[in-house]
């Protein structure tokens, strides 16, 4: 853990447009554990593989658990869905996982201050490789109740 705090690595900007969510999240989680600070942009354009109807049904059943007064609270915004997916691939209940999670920022679209920055992509997570159906995180979020004005 001391290694992560003493190192100051530059901020890496990752463009999630057209990347498979789970594969991207696992690669980013690994890099976060090495101490890198990562910013993910275009979170709503990442893709989820599988049949849209099945994934939406599973998500709505999962969302039925809990409520407003008591947890668990479920993410509906695309940036929250992506952030939570990365969190699931970190050892979040340990100090190194919490510290790594703090080094992650996720945005819908591209913020003005990051537009001129060089953006990376994850080569192993390209959606072009998929032979099955897929849909975007933005479509998924709209189906489970995200209002784009939020």
PLM region spans:
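Ribosome-associated RNA-binding proteins
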Residues: 1-150
